[in-house]
């Protein structure tokens, strides 16, 4: 017999079935939220993985197309690699869970959330996030949970808890907050310039809901939870730390890590490591964990410098931003480019414009999101950190960073009506020493403006870090963290926005949560830094969007036709529209409402295509004059094509003012002629005349 538990959550019923399915996993919960069903499982290996110095956690959010009554596309007709949305959801599930596992745990842990049914009223991300927490809490896997997750929307100034898919589409805020019993442990947000005070209010609205969910989870764990298993700790032996300090005193390690140059610091630490290897040459068991021991020693040293001495590794003040530089148009012939440098972090972003037909098509579980006109892609090559690795395409980190920058910029993009382009920005990481995702937001803003994209306002991003002591009041918030402060600190709090509000947040931490005081201070600190970057760097580099797109960017003409004429313009099996495209070299996109976009580089070709479409879509009246081409000659006259798929007949008597015996004496195939419309003949064909064209129209 299985056990079932239910609670009301945001006006819908959340039901959790324990012991019903997947009983061979360490923990499993079949989650029902409305008609949305997600199977969440937690499984751990029986033995630790050898030779690693990290906790091997993997999270898989699996979207099954049968959940929305679809058969997957493609040749194989089955689910393939994870979609971008699935990867991003996996990361959101991972981030609040990871800090709650023991730091010295080395057993492989896999969390799988399989979406089996989707109710548009109940977002599957919610039961997936809660299911992972419940499955892990009731398992025998060591875990300091529970944690709970809630989403918040903002419509007409009112907060919506766990908004439906339709509500998310119209919301000014898409916020996800995870909490432990007392503290916030993860924040992810996309927002339409939401003020800082409103954002904090929304975060703690979600935190309140999370406390009710945690009580619900506690009840399940009390009745169904297994005893946590003991595990082999992989912590560095204390006697090794003591021996290291004898050879390399704390003052010497401080000197090694204190530098504003990343490579100098890394070389200093490498020399310390070599010194220790020589000293411990006869202690194989210590050599096996020496790398982790040196890492931990660096960490303790840096944290002590910051927390006790208020001294950062590169000598900056606690609120000081690294040196900034910005420039645009650094790459010729592309549609727009910009480079943003912050200390030893450097990003170049290139913008490409294309017709709306080239927008990315999405085939996922969200019926309200079928395409994406703005794409931001982030690349992180190994040379940016001085390493050698083969390039194997974007990983989860690159996809996550790209999505964060994309989310930050979407609120300021012009509408399709204002700017009928698909837009792609690609951020290339030239150099990395922390906060590359935020630098890519700054570079993308300038690149879009340089490309002539009329964004409403510039956007900048900055990240704050944190070092905590033994009590909640013992902490230091750091503005603009570099790589070392990210690795050894407790928080990476990224915030992007305009002068008027926040457009994106992503908060990752390595501790068990943040107090409200820290959250408020971090948000205030990022606002201060963001204002500085916008005013002193971005707006001085490029004051606003260029008045038009660049010389090498495609131009777009828009016209409106009667929707009932769309079939005439397209033609049978696309023959007419393809002929226009072949003749002019332009790209054409037509919406169901009759909005036609003509895209090309050559203005003359675009105008020619526009004329053709207007002629095809027009109901002809007597007296209209056209220019066409002779496509057929008969004894009784000639047929003239005046637009692809559109033709009319010129009777032999209407060719010349003088009488002629043979059409061929005057016209040949391919001749370009000007004709005037006489109406329709008895057979319903367009009837033209060449001889009746006014003299001024012939010129």
PLM features: residue spans?
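Flexible, glycine/charged-enriched surface loops at secondary-structure junctions
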Residues: 103-109, 144-146, 213-231, 263, ...
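Glycine-rich, flexible beta-strand/loop modules in the N-terminal catalytic cores of phosphate-handling
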Residues: 25-109, 115-117, 121-122, 188, ...
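Mobile "lid/hinge" segments at catalytic clefts and subdomain interfaces of large enzymes
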Residues: 140-257, 448-547
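Long, basic N-terminal domains or extensions that often function
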Residues: 1-232
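Long, charged amphipathic helices and adjacent flexible linkers at domain junctions
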Residues: 231-241, 532-559, 607-627
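Extended amphipathic alpha-helical scaffolds
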Residues: 1-45, 229-369, 554-568, 576, ...
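Single-stranded RNA-binding regions, centering on S1/OB-family and related RNA-binding modules
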Residues: 552-556, 563-699
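Conserved phosphate/anionic-ligand binding catalytic regions in large, soluble enzymes, centered on
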Residues: 27-29, 122-141, 328-351, 433-453, ...
